[in-house]
Structure formats: C-alpha cells, structure tokens
Amino acid sequence: QRGLPAITDKWKRAQAAIDAGADLVFELPFYYAVQAGEIFAQGAVRLLSDLQVSSIICGSEHADIDFINLAAHEPDISGNSNFDKKNRTFASNYAAALEEKTGFYLENANDILAFSYAKAILNQNLTEKIKLRTISRVSADYHDQFLNDGEIASATAIRKALSEGQNVDSYTPMSDLQYTDYEARLFQLLKYRLSTDGLGQIRSIYQVNEGMEYLIKQAIEKNPSDFGELLALIKSKRYTFARLHRVLVYILLNIKVDQMNLAMQNPYHRLLGFTEKGRQYLHEKKGRFNFPTISHVDQKTANKSLAIDYKAGLVYNQIMDYKSTQDIKRTPIQS
C-alpha cells in the first residue's frame, strides 16, 4: 500500500511468518498489494475466500467496533454539495458523512483497513462464510516515527531506525536487517523513465489521470535532486503521498491500464511457505479452489501469469541490491 520497497524480501518475511506459527503463507500479488486500501482489501478477501478461510483477523485502533455493521452504513457522498462546499479531501468528507450516520469518526490507519475488509466481505456476500475479527493495536501508532521502550514499534519507526543505523532486533523476529538506501536507487531509475517518457506514455499508465502526467513531467523538468524533492514538486491537495508513491512505481514498471485490469481478471495463489499441517490442508482442498495455486515458477509462468510480479521482483532486486532471484526457480519454504 505504501508504494515503497519492503525493507526485506518476501522470502525472509515468509520465513518469519512460518517461524511465528503460520501454516501457510501466500503472497498478495502486486496488482492487489500496491493499491489504495479499498482495492487492497477487496483483493485480499477475494483470494482468502477462494482459499476457504473462516475468519480474517486484522489489527485495529478500535477493536471493540463492529466493522461489518459499520460498513453496512457506508455513506454515499457523491453529488452531496454540503460536503463539497467544505473544501475538504474525499477521505475527510467520507469520514464526516459516516460519523453523521453512525457516530464513529473513521480516521486511524488500521481502522480504515479493517473497515475496507468489512466492506469487501459485504460486497462479496461473504458474511455467512467469513467472520471479521480485530485485535487492538497497542504501544505504537501506525505513523509513529520513533522506537519506544517496549518491544512493539511501527513499521515507519523501524524503517527510520534502520536508516539511522540503530539495532531493531528486539522489535522484529527478523534479525540482522540491513538498511539499503532504496530512495536514491529508486530515484535514479525513475529519473531516467520520467525524463525519456513523453506525456502520452505517462498518461497511459495505470492510475495516471486528471492531468497528473503534466504535474509529473513539470516536476522532473525542474531537475529535483532526490526522491523527496520529486514528490514535493508533484504533491497537491488532491493526491496523498501514498497515492503518488504508487503511481511512480506504476510508471517505473510501465504498467498500463489494460495490463493491470487483465491481471486482476486472472488471480492466482502464490505459495511462499508451508508446514506439514499447511500441506495437509492444501491436499484436502485440492481441486476445490477456483484460482490456480503457483508454487514453482519457470520462465513461461513468469512471463505470463506472473508478468507484473516478476517484473516488480526484478526491479526490487536492483533497488535493494539483492543477488538471489525473487521468483524463477524459487520453491516454497517448508517447515
């Protein structure tokens, strides 16, 4: 969702999940993962439903809230001039409208994602099949910038601490994490792409609309010195930083609208790791999933079914200076 490279690759994260007790680990594909919260949640619920889960558990700042009931009162603010006149962002208008209907003001990051999961469960008519359960987010807020004295920290704080050379072993089960100056490498790749692509090429990229291509082109022509300056030159009230991060990644990977739509129409389950219990579950459910399960990737699969994820993996390795492949010939972790 952040539109930024993960600080360590999916295989190390999958191993950490297995070590922590997970029996099956699947990758949320790029076309659902690098998205706004609503599409992220819709995609996750779609895949988890096909895997026949009975519950989805997520963190929330207000774990006592019934998010399914809250989502059932989703407001429609389209064409509502009372909100339009207040010159607020869509998110602020939406939260205000929801508060008018329910008394709850939706503003915290994890609450918003839990609400998105609830909407996805409702929209896909899964309330009888999947229960949404939330656990309280404690000790660290999503946006916290600094490590605290306990053993729980936000991902933002962990990233920042790593960039400053601090040890974060007590805050994550993944030991020996190394910080890579991904912003500098990401910026160099982006600078080349944005300098050589014309307006038409940028306009054809997924999620580039409302004249955003002009803002982006004007920004790069001002010769920004780094990634942060590039973002500042593009930023406006209309676009969040997360939205801009994602769009710049789409541009870097040259992902067109039709490519993204085609990928979403052909979902799959990418298996990253399993235990014996997980293997037994897959064996019991064999032939009962609608979407294919991919455990081994050859060049043909990489170029076809996994085209976007494969390309993202190649660029990720360049940015993070990883030598091992992310996809070709990689097999699921077994425990």
Region roles according to the model:
Residues L28-S335:
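Active-site cores that bind ATP or allylic diphosphates and position pyrophosphate for catalysis
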Residues Q1-G3, D23, Y31:
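N-terminal capping/interface segment
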Residues W11-A16, K86-F90:
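Short low-complexity stretches enriched in small and charged residues
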Residues Q1-R13:
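N-terminal catalytic cores of NTP/NDP-binding nucleotidyl/phosphoryl-transfer enzymes
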Residues Q15, D19-P29:
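A glycine-rich helix N-cap at a beta->alpha junction
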